[in-house]
């Protein structure tokens, strides 16, 4: 792949956030966007290049991981710290649970001066993300004995069953979470935000491109050094 040395906007890392940012910017059709990802780009959802464990929404993926481990403390063993190294980042790797959280967090952030982060102001974006990421509830046929046993056990502790785990104003409750699984496939952020703009002429995706330095001039990042095909490549954001 011939990597352009200049682009309008550079996005480093195609994790969940990077995929969303690059996809949204490229959809505006007014600037060239380059997305650099240290791991491989397996292409769109129908490319047939995706490893089975990254697609399978019923298991936690084990491949294409950075291999981080926690430090051993007080004689305790190291623990794996799963961080995906592939297009879509950890949205290509995780348990597909879609939980919005509590209004308390968002309203607290806004009270600290972060305007626009109140629960009511972020709520429309949650609905939009749910639609784009194909978030849905489990079908009755998908509910396993484990799910049922877990929910029943939690109810016995006094925590009530809730009809909607994503009610920002429901402060406690148990239920089976919504998931971003489409036809048994983990519907990751790359599928949701990059696939629609892959061929529009405004987005370039460079997989296996490890950024090892961001160059800053006058408090503004203007270029990066990336290792591509074992060579250091300088790419500018104009």
Explain the meaning of each model-derived region.
Residues 1-238:
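N-terminal redox-cofactor-binding region of secreted/periplasmic oxidoreductases
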């Amino acid at each position: 792949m011939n990597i352009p040395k200049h682009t309008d906007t550079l996005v480093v890392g195609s994790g969940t956030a990077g995929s969303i940012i690059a996809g949204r910017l490229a959809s505006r059709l007014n600037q060239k966007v380059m997305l650099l990802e240290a791991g491989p780009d397996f292409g769109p959802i129908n490319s047939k290049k995706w490893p089975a464990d990254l697609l399978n929404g019923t298991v936690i993926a084990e491949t294409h991981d950075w291999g981080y481990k926690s430090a051993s403390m007080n004689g305790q063993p190291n623990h794996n710290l799963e961080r995906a190294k592939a297009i879509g980042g950890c949205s290509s790797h995780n348990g597909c649970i879609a939980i919005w959280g509590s209004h308390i967090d968002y309203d607290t952030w806004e009270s600290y001066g972060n305007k626009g982060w109140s629960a009511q102001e972020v709520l429309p974006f949650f609905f939009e993300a749910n639609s784009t990421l194909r978030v849905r509830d489990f079908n009755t046929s998908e509910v396993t004995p484990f799910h049922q046993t877990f929910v029943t056990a939690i109810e016995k502790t006094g925590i009530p069953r809730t009809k909607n785990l994503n009610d920002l104003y429901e402060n406690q409750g148990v239920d089976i979470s919504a998931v971003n699984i489409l036809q048994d496939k983990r519907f990751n952020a790359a599928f949701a935000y990059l696939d629609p703009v892959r061929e529009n002429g405004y987005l370039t995706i460079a997989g296996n491109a490890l950024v090892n330095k961001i160059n800053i001039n006058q408090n503004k990042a203007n270029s990066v050094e990336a290792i591509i095909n074992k060579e250091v490549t300088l790419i500018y954001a104009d």
